[in-house]
Amino acid sequence: MDVLELSAIDPEQRELVGGKAAGLAALIRLGVRVPDGFCVTTDAHSRGEVPRTEVLAAYERLGAGPVAVRSSATAEDLPDASFAGQQDTFLAVEGAEDVLAAIRACWDSLHSERATAYRKAAGIGHDAVRMAVVVQRMVDPEVAGVLFTANPLTGSRSECVVDAAPGLGTAVVDGAAPADHYVLDGTAPEERGCLAPARSNELREVGERLRSRLGAPQDVEWAYDKDGTLWLLQSRPITTLFPAPPASDRPGPRLYVEFGHVQGMLQPVTPVGMSTLKEMLAGMLASFGMTVEIVDIGGRLYGDLTDAMRDPVTRRRLVKLMAVDFGPRAQAVVEHLLDDPRFAPVRGTRRRNTAALGTAPKAVVGILGALARPAARARVFGTIERLGRQPVVDPPTAAELLPLVEETERPDAGVEAITWPVVTGILVAAVLPALLKDIAGDDEIRTVLGGMPHNVTIEMDLALWQVARRAAPCRELLLGRSPDELAAAHLAGELPDIGLTTFLDTYGHRCAAEVDAGVPRWSEAPAPVFAALANYLRVTDPDQGPDRRFERAAVRAELMLAELVRRARRERPLRGRLAGFFLRRARELAGLREAGKFAGLYALRDRRRRLLLIGAELREKGLLERADDIRFLTLPELRSVVDGGDDPRRTVAERKSHYARELRRRTVPVALLSDGTDVETLLPARTSDGRTLTGTGAATGRARGPARVVRDPADAYVEPGEILVAPTSDPGWTPLFLTAGGLVTETGAVMAHGPTVAREYGIPAVICVPGATDRIRTGQMITVDGAAGTVTLDAPDAEPGGGPRVGVAADADAVSASSGSAGG
């Protein structure tokens, strides 16, 4: 079938008519006005010959007047890739031969340089794409433009946005001419510009109808003709929006805060990981008396904090919680919404916190015990070692394994040996700013918290450094092959013994995004470990080894601690004793922050192993293509498959595609309102001179060097002295810090994993720098100032050698900064 009337097309015929024609067919089915037209199908394109007779007959039926000839590729107007402007459109084409020529030109545009590059960036194979062409009667517009049925800047589904201009809408679509801009929020529109209020209202009504009926916010091209009739020329999903929260029957609006920022994890969580994490998080929060609904939005974990925001007592405490655990971005969002009347405190809704009351006695005893006996940390590591070594027996069948996967892990009898020292370390570090008010600056306190002992992530990185030193004789081998090749060789037992097996016995249950049970551990997929080893082998100056850097950070910390105690003692002897006590306890206990998670990962390791055993059985039964495909099923779905033999392969394929799309997403909102509004877009814009990026200082010191922009740590390398620029950082990223001269991230919290490790190594860190990975390019010279919280970009013509660029300089600056403060 080579030619179809638009009115005869089924919207599901995308492979035959392409995205644009399928979208127009959907509009026609909804009863909105669409200019008459026809589609030259992909069958004709596959044969490479324009069906002349059929096209001319269809053109005659349109009246043989001016028409628009528009590309309609099968990979166009997709839910995750619009292809806007990537293939050609020809307007006001008139005459049979010109129409035929325009159709051929649309076909040719499928392989244009811009369309090919767009498909490559979107991960769409070139061979899988075919082209149809839409031919429609031209509308002679009085005014035309674009309607977004959600606000593309804020994400709000409560607003429609219109850009309009007199005449053809191409000037608006192409950005070639100024347009009148309208944000339609349901209030009476203004009388201004080229769009009358009645037309604004009509566009909003149409937009809301399309959004509701088509199941997603739409980007709509429209035109009003000289008679005042509204025509819709195209509708496609807005592909850049972050998904909106699921509908809730609770009174709105609701506030959802993303939990991945706490862990430095922005990639989507697999469905099986989501099942596990929602259960774990809800249980953890309940133990502290907090009932928080955990929801999946775009594959990320968000918590509904609306009730806490409206509680007269907890709303102010929430700001402090955000500052400590969620970071300055979340803190700014909560502070902003405290003044929003929609989140005004509501009296009489506070519930008795019975869970917290039940936990309080244990907490008091545990915290006081940790403060009195910090050496009890030895029990922490004893418990961790026991959890890692305890024997586990796996039953042989999926039916027997699944209950072990489904059950909530019961707290181990010795877990309290970990919990209270960890909690105490976090609390002591958190009270230091108040205790040392008017005595120490934030950067000085961060110096004290550098080079801290007992941090399992630091110990892991240092252990890998020792593996690298042992591997020195194999340097050529390890630098000459890719991390993936080396990983395959290691798993096959084909590499020399460099101590990596011993390292993985202890740390192989870790990885980037390690809280997701669906993500392979290093023991299964050690390519990131080999990438880190390659980085370490490039360190030729022993003084820049992580062990030396850690030692220097510890020396600076002890010197600063002594200086702060002296300052406090000069003011009042009692304050000096208190300062000394809490500063020393902070250094002794705050490094344990990672221990609880590290221990909990053993249970996650066992759960993943059992999931893979179930997956292997399902693969043998033909229900999965690969054992690891089990990660794309939730636990309830997995139960249905194991018990009833449901075939999950179609669900798995759809989830894989969705997961791959979300992996490409570059930004994840730290907080959303229930209508999809990204709350950060409501905050006042930061001022900038174009060269200075502002964030939050998280590790003191100053360093200048070439940037290394990394979005995935799996196979990344960082040359000694380069400044690592990343979207985030969790423990799976920290091996890259050993060669970095500084750290810049787009997210994070001062006490989170990345900044903590940066302080241990004495490298400056600035976190929460908006758009850092887009605004900074690899190789660009930048200066990181951890005290000021700034990243300064060199002018394009600046000499790369114009300042310090390696770790020595970064450490020297940090030392001088600390020494200068100590003498103040």
Where are these regions (language model features)?
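N-terminal beta-alpha lobe that positions the nucleotide/phosphoryl donor
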Residues: M1-V134, V143, I384-E400, E406, ...
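Phosphate-interacting basic helix/loop segments used at nucleotide- and nucleic-acid interfaces
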Residues: E49-P66, A132, R199-V220, Y224
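Structural motif
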Residues: R33, F38, P66-A68, D88, ...
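Acidic, glycine-rich flexible loop/linker segments
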Residues: R199, L203-Q218, D225-F242, A707-E722, ...
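Extended active-site and interfacial segments that coordinate phosphate-rich ligands
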Residues: A21, Q86-A117, D140-P197, L232-A286, ...
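Conserved phosphate/anionic-ligand binding catalytic regions in large, soluble enzymes, centered on
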Residues: E15-T41, R70-V99, M138-D180, Q218-L241, ...
